[in-house]
Curated annotation (Swiss-Prot):
Name assigned to this protein: Dapper homolog 1
Listed Polar residues bias regions: 407-417
Effect of T808K: Found in a patient with encephalocele; uncertain significance
Keyword vocabulary terms for this entry: Coiled coil, Cytoplasm, Deafness, Developmental protein, Disease variant, Neurogenesis, Nucleus, Phosphoprotein, Synapse, Wnt signaling pathway
Motif (Bipartite nuclear localization signal): 610-623
PANTHER family: DAPPER HOMOLOG 1, DAPPER-RELATED
């Protein structure tokens, strides 16, 4: 479609074999010839108009100079009689009035021309539309004909598109050139507010035409706009498409002020050089470069000339940057003009669409948006380790369902470990406080920090330690913390099951990690049930360390006593907290059950403690969670309420404060677990013991645990690292009798849970820690961890037990049941026990 020299060549060459090509070449040739003729006519017309404008300007200047001279002469001849002076003054006034009238008449003429221009433009638009309709119809017909006669003839000639481009485009060019040029000519003087529209129309007129014609029209329009805006028009000196500017009337563009190339010299309109300078290239570039300034000058000049309000209005129009001026600035490249115009149109249409942007954020409230993104935030920390990711996910699910706030906290967490800690603490706080238990883990953390700054500090220290121990543990812990918080709150009940599901794989991972020395994230369920304060050494190894932290945070909020704060220190409420992380997790539900006065819950806690370490334990944990939730609801125990939660979280402090020990004692392992794991090997046990010792030493060094609390947390076995001791503990556990409460708080724990006070306690702690480690290692000491978890529930300090006689530990023969359970779970466990 785009005319090219080839088209002209075709026209000159003998008829081509194809009729379509001949027809196409002929219209193109005619169009090119017509365009050249139009260009010449435009140039000639422009020259003549410029000359006429120059003459008119000179005439005006002559008259003005004459008036000035006469006035000067009159002033000089002041010696003359007053009457003659008066007569002269009257004559001068009359002349001035005549000049003013002339100016006014000229202004009125300009306004009329503008009106005519507008009318013509309207007519031109109508004609354009009609022509476009014709072209469209022709194209449609052409398409139909093409489908029928595609092989016989070229569709283009029959379409009439080329004919239209030849004739219709000629008519379009006529309409655009004649109508719009007249418009421009009439409007340029009046600040050509029509010129922008005209330019646009000219472009539209040129659209049907070939690209070359469009370029010519655009160029012409740009020049016209420049002239209208006061920019020097591209006159004869510019041989380009200025001639396309068809100016029917004397173009008032020559009445605009001229600015020299450097922009320093400004020639006001009524100047002798103006008419000639308008055509001078000296002012062309400068004026083109500063179309807006030219427009302003034009407005000023028009106001000076006309001095009328009408001209002022026109000036205002001219001063406004018109599309024409913008186009004139970019006229050097018609393609750029076209692109800019299209862009502006597109932007105009796209702006309203931008209102849809709010849809990107469903909630305008930033908090809600954060909540919506909380899952992402939670997952990011979880990414540290698979176990952590699962735990974080679970915690996120639990926390977010319970309350949207946790997601905000999640968003705030920088390290996953810190975040999980905060979330645990916050969740604990939320439990204590009416805040949604799972919701503001961060808020709960803040509350905890406020309520128990000391405990919070130890917890943070513990977390730091855990992080030092292994980054895996800290992410895991954070995940566990978040998971634990969901578990801990009854509202999180649904979330904990999910966590359980996640936890089972996590447990496996955690076991492996603990073997590696990095504790896998504690199953969210366990962590939820009993967030164990993370211990320096065992925490990273124990799955429940994060839970201990969470629980510790909860306990911190609820139990400010030194014991609990010490527990809250990274280790958790109890020294066993970390070791018992899994047990604590189970314990969490068990504690809840105890608080609720549900022996079944306590048993579940045992099972839960086992679960803590194993996938099956996850199921048990779920049961424990359910039972504990029920217990919370029915008993309204500490877990039922926010305070109850911390009590459940810190079994020792919580049990003592809330009489958890009673429930722990009351509950006999009623459920026979089918999900028991194999017992840990002696090597694993020894390793866990070593870990426990290290943690214990850290705790002691840090002074995290008060004397009474550290004892339960660090059971004698926790201090003991020998495998024989561990096996002895197991044996005593399986031994038969559960000694009531022994003098040692730790022994109380173990005795209540396992039947042998000392061995049980040491086992509980040792197993808790070592199990946490070995369980993550998949060593199979989950049974111990389960018991330990149960023990922590029961591991209420002796004073607590005494304070709460209802919670007094009951003597039970657990060895038989435990043996059966172990046998059900794995024969290797029993073998280990017997060998020990």
């Amino acid at each position: 479609m785009k005319p090219s020299p080839a088209g002209t060549a075709k026209e000159l060459e003998p008829p081509a074999p194809a009729r379509g090509e001949q027809r196409t070449a002929e219209p193109e040739g005619r169009w090119r010839e017509k365009g050249e003729a139009d260009t010449e006519r435009q140039r000639t017309r422009e020259r003549q108009e410029a000359t006429l404008a120059g003459l008119a300007e000179l005439e005006y200047l002559r008259q003005r100079q004459e008036l000035l001279v006469r006035g000067a002469l009159r002033g000089a001849g002041g010696a003359g009689a007053a009457a003659p002076r008066a007569g002269e003054l009257l004559g001068e006034a009359a002349q001035r009035s005549r000049l003013e009238e002339k100016f006014l008449e000229e202004n009125i003429l300009l306004l009329r021309k503008q009106l005519n221009c507008l009318r013509r433009r309207d007519a031109g638009l109508l004609n354009q539309l009609q022509e476009l309709d014709k072209q469209i119809s022709d194209l449609r017909l052409d398409v139909e004909k093409t489908s029928e006669e595609h092989l016989e003839t070229d569709s283009r000639p029959s379409s009439g598109f080329y004919e239209l481009s030849d004739g219709a485009s000629g008519s379009l060019s006529n309409s655009s050139n004649s109508v719009f040029s007249e418009c421009l000519s009439s409007c340029h003087s009046s600040t050509c507010f029509c010129s922008p529209l005209e330019a646009t129309l000219s472009l539209s007129d040129g659209c049907p035409k070939s690209a070359d014609l469009i370029g010519l029209l655009e160029y012409k329009e740009g020049h016209c706009e420049d002239q209208a805006s006061g920019a020097v028009c591209r006159s004869l000196s510019t041989p380009q498409f200025n001639s396309l500017d068809v100016i029917a009337d004397v173009n008032p563009k020559y009445q605009c002020d001229l600015v020299s190339k450097n922009g320093n010299d400004v020639y006001r309109y009524p100047s002798p050089l103006h008419a000639v300078a308008v055509q001078s290239p000296m002012f062309l570039l400068c004026l083109t470069g500063n179309p807006l300034r030219e427009e302003d000058r034009l407005g000023n000049h028009a106001s000076d000339i006309c001095g009328g309000s009408e001209l002022d209005a026109v000036k205002t129009d001219s001063s406004l940057p018109s599309p024409s001026s913008l186009w004139s600035a970019s006229h050097p490249s018609s393609s750029k003009k076209m692109d800019g115009y299209i862009l502006s149109l597109v932007q105009k249409k796209t702006h309203p669409v931008r209102t849809n942007k709010p849809r990107t954020s469903v909630n305008a409230d930033p908090t809600k948006g954060l909540l919506r993104n909380g899952s992402v935030c939670v997952r990011a920390p979880g990414g540290v380790s698979q176990g952590n990711s699962v735990n974080l996910k679970n915690s996120k699910q639990a926390c977010l369902p319970s309350g949207g706030i946790p997601s905000l906290n999640n968003g705030t967490f920088s390290p996953p470990k810190q975040w999980s800690k905060e979330s645990k603490a916050e969740q604990a706080e939320s439990k204590r406080v009416p805040l949604p238990e799972g919701c503001p883990s961060g808020a709960a953390s803040d509350l905890q920090s406020k309520h128990l700054p000391k405990t919070a500090k130890p917890a943070s220290q513990e977390h730091a330690r855990c992080s030092a121990i292994g980054t895996g543990e800290s992410p895991k812990e954070s995940a566990q913390l978040s998971g634990a918080s969901p578990k801990e709150s009854p509202s999180r009940g649904p979330a904990p099951p999910q966590e359980n599901k996640v936890v089972q794989p996590l447990k496996k991972m955690s076991q492996k990690n603990s073997l590696q020395g990095v504790p896998p994230a504690t199953p969210p369920l366990l962590s939820t049930a009993f967030p164990v304060e993370e211990r320096p050494a065992l925490d990273f190894k124990s799955e429940g360390s994060s839970q201990s932290l969470e629980e510790a945070h909860l306990v911190k909020a609820q139990f400010i006593p030194g014991q609990q704060p010490s527990v809250r220190l990274h280790r958790g409420h109890r020294n066993m907290g970390v070791v018992k992380n899994s047990s604590l997790k189970h314990r969490g539900p068990a504690l809840q059950g105890l608080e609720n006065g549900l022996p079944t819950v306590r048993e579940k806690t045992r099972a839960g403690s086992k679960k803590c370490r194993f996938p099956d334990d996850l199921d048990t944990n779920k049961k424990l969670k359910k039972a504990s939730s029920k217990g919370r609801k029915s008993g309204g125990g500490p877990e039922a309420g926010v305070p109850g939660r911390p009590a459940g979280g810190g079994h020792r402090a919580g049990s003592r404060a809330h009489g958890h020990g009673r429930e722990a004692v009351v509950a006999k392992p009623k459920h026979k677990r089918t999900d028991y794991r194999r017992w840990k090997s002696s090597a694993e046990i020894s390793y866990e013991e070593a870990l426990r010792r290290a943690r214990r030493g850290r705790r002691e060094n840090v002074g995290l645990y008060p004397a009474p609390v550290p004892l339960p947390y660090a059971s004698p076995y926790a201090y003991v690292a020998s495998d024989s001791e561990y096996s002895a503990e197991c044996e005593s556990l399986f031994h038969s009798t559960v000694v009531d409460t022994s003098e040692d708080e730790q022994s109380n724990y173990t005795t209540n849970c396992f039947g042998d006070s000392e061995s049980s306690v040491s086992e509980g702690e040792f197993v808790g820690e070592s199990t946490t480690t070995s369980d993550s290692e998949e060593s199979g000491g989950l049974i111990w961890s389960q018991f330990v978890q149960t023990l922590p529930i029961q591991t209420v300090t002796a004073p607590d037990l005494h304070n709460h006689p209802a919670k007094t530990f009951v003597k039970i023969k657990a060895s038989h049941n435990l043996k059966k359970k172990i046998l059900r779970f794995r024969s290797g466990s029993l073998k280990l026990m017997t060998t020990v």
